[in-house]
């Protein structure tokens, strides 16, 4: 009788990184406020509320929807080109516009059933 060689498992079966995101673009421009006036008004007059909505949409807690990290997470999740530096500069220069852009993008991806 032959002894069987031991099998060494180096990775857990069925667990690993998910599929790579497909390349896409933002659904609307950063200053494309008139494509969804409700989001624009909410971002202008109740910025913290919109930040909480975005955070909740992304299953995050607190007001981190307004942060560079949230924008970077969203961009990388959907394969949107850019860099952390781009996200930082956009969020620094116009936080209202960037937050509204993320919320419009979420709404459009939901409508397309890709969110």
Swiss-Prot record:
GO terms for biological process: brown fat cell differentiation; defense response to bacterium; negative regulation of apoptotic process; negative regulation of multicellular organism growth; positive regulation of cell population proliferation; positive regulation of cold-induced thermogenesis; positive regulation of transcription by RNA polymerase II; response to cold. One of its GO terms (cellular component) is extracellular region. Expressed at high levels in plasmacytoid dendritic cells. High expression in spleen, lymph nodes, peripheral blood leukocytes, and bone marrow, with lower expression in thymus, appendix, and fetal liver. Disulfide bonds: none annotated. It holds the Pfam family PLAC8. GO terms for molecular function: chromatin binding. Coiled coil: none annotated. It comes from the Eukaryota. Belongs to the cornifelin family. PANTHER family: DUF614 FAMILY PROTEIN-RELATED. This is Placenta-specific gene 8 protein.
